Amino acid sequence: MWSRCSISKRLTSFGIAQVINKITSSALDALATVRDGATVLIGGFGTAGIPDELIAALIECRLRELTVVNNNAGNGDTGLAALLKTGAVRKLICSFPRQTDSHIFDALYRANQIELELVPQGNLAERLRAAGAGLGGFFTPTGYGTALALHPDGSP
């Protein structure tokens, strides 16, 4: 019997549920389909729940031009910060890029070596939910009617 954590279901183009086995023999096997330029969602909050083994395997893959979606920009020198340090990440989408120990991201950003898309935490969660549900987008009043809505790049 499959455990609920090891499988997921998806609908085929004919609407038939298909079981997908998510069990792999290693972290590298789990990342076998990730390619240069991929968008990677990395779970966790601060240092809690970070998939360190998968991040280490991602570093070992030596991928480039990644877009990473995470709540923050990494802490210290481990986990997401270690991935950022390799130069593999082109763009970071997050809610909270600046912690007291986010020196790796800070240095990359100040040197214009990484792009940042800052998204309010609730909007980030809703974007992920909407994408997982196959929705094209959603309306949020955040920023509506402000200068930011007219000029998302911050220009006057």
Give the residues covered by each predicted segment:
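Conserved alpha/beta enzyme-core scaffold
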Residues: 15-156
